[in-house]
Amino acid sequence: MFESFYKNKRVLVTGATGFKGSWLVLWLKKLGADVRGYALKPNTVPSMFDALRISEKVPTVFGNILDRDLLEKTFNEFKPEIVFHLAAQPLVRLSYAEPVLTYETNVIGSLNVLEAARRCGSVKAFVNVTTDKCYENKEVAKG
């Protein structure tokens, strides 16, 4: 079912160098999608992206989602039909230390990705991947 849907579809994955993004681009590639990544360079050693040698399998643009010009160029050149948006500043502790960076990346950066998708005209589906941290923690009594 998935294979027939994704086969030959142009799919762009933001956050492709992250843990989830790395696995997603490989899975989409295995399903026959024409996949492109857009992400910062991996910031851990080793990284899943490097360990799986994804740069040899999936063309990836190394850039920041705050860079509107590079985002628009990437969208306009590749013309994705489907976008999986995983790029974010996900670290809670860093968000306390760097709240402006976190807000810019997670809010303005996401807006930039959405706007690039809207303007390029080829996107038919946009999947915004988020985190459990966006929900209020409710303590449940265990019994």
What does each of the following model-derived ranges do?
Residues 1-143:
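N-terminal Rossmann-like NAD(P)+-binding domain of SDR-like oxidoreductases, especially those catalyzing
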